[in-house]
Curated annotation (Swiss-Prot):
The gene is Rab2b. The keyword Nucleotide-binding applies. Regulated by guanine nucleotide exchange factors (GEFs) which promote the exchange of bound GDP for free GTP, GTPase activating proteins (GAPs) which increase the GTP hydrolysis activity, and GDP dissociation inhibitors (GDIs) which inhibit the dissociation of the nucleotide from the GTPase. The lineage of its organism: Eukaryota, Metazoa, Chordata, Craniata, Vertebrata. This is Ras-related protein Rab-2B. Interacts (in GTP-bound form) with GARIN4 (via N-terminus). Interacts (in GTP-bound form) with GARIN5A. Interacts (in GTP-bound form) with GARIN1B. Interacts with VPS39 and VPS41. It comes from Mus musculus (Mouse). Pfam families: Ras. It is a lipid-anchor.
């Protein structure tokens, strides 16, 4: 299938926060409760529709273990978007966000779009990080923020789509050099897409997602 652009994503965060599950839910629409630890990187891809254009998302799921951080760093280069994930039931994964963010910004393009994700929102009774804390961290560091559940699929689609919308907005503003693939964007074989039907229904804009739009 032809596409207007290809956007490269990287998923980062501590081990066990649900990075692989978020990828699987988005690409295959299924949840795998028992998942082997990612060794190095895993890969997934899916087409989405942004403003009537077909966009191919190429997603790299990275290992969270410290021993693989050097491998992970090499994938920051050439990524247009990053999903920075923590587990709302494990405070330490939230505390480590600053380290992950420093790594991402040191080794990536300054225009890379970063979506902060508080995953496992289905485990509300075990919550250890308040939603307001995630929102505050995102505001402080200029990130987009959502809480998701890879198990129920709540907000998973929106997280990927809204990241792509922000990347596309930056392209429209001329902030990304789309002719330089080091920025994580590749012009597709057919940039004019005549089909108006995509695999995803229209999603809310980031600005439309208020503090009350949590998972059901």
């Amino acid at each position: 299938m032809t596409y207007a652009y290809l956007f490269k994503y990287i998923i980062i965060g501590d081990t066990g926060v649900g990075k692989s599950c978020l990828l699987l839910q988005f690409t295959d629409k299924r949840f795998q409760p028992v998942h082997d630890l990612t060794i190095g990187v895993e890969f997934g891809a899916r087409m989405v529709n942004i403003d009537g254009k077909q966009i191919k998302l190429q997603i790299w799921d990275t290992a969270g273990q410290e021993s693989f951080r050097s491998i992970t760093r090499s994938y920051y280069r050439g990524a247009a978007g990053a999903l920075l994930v923590y587990d709302i039931t494990r405070r330490e994964t939230f505390n480590h966000l600053t380290s992950w963010l420093e790594d991402a910004r040191q080794h990536s393009s300054s225009n890379m779009v970063i979506m902060l994700i508080g995953n496992k929102s289905d485990l509300e009774s075990r919550r250890d990080v308040k939603r307001e804390e995630g929102e505050a961290f995102a505001r402080e560091h200029g990130l987009i923020f959502m809480e998701t559940s890879a198990k129920t699929a709540c907000n998973v689609e929106e997280a990927y789509i809204n990241t792509a919308k922000e990347i596309y907005r930056k392209i429209q503003q001329g902030l990304f050099d789309v002719h330089n693939e080091a920025n994580g964007i590749k012009i597709g074989p057919q940039q004019s897409i005549t089909s108006s039907v995509g695999p995803c229904s229209p999603q809310q804009n980031v600005s439309d997602i208020g503090p009350d739009s949590g998972c059901c």
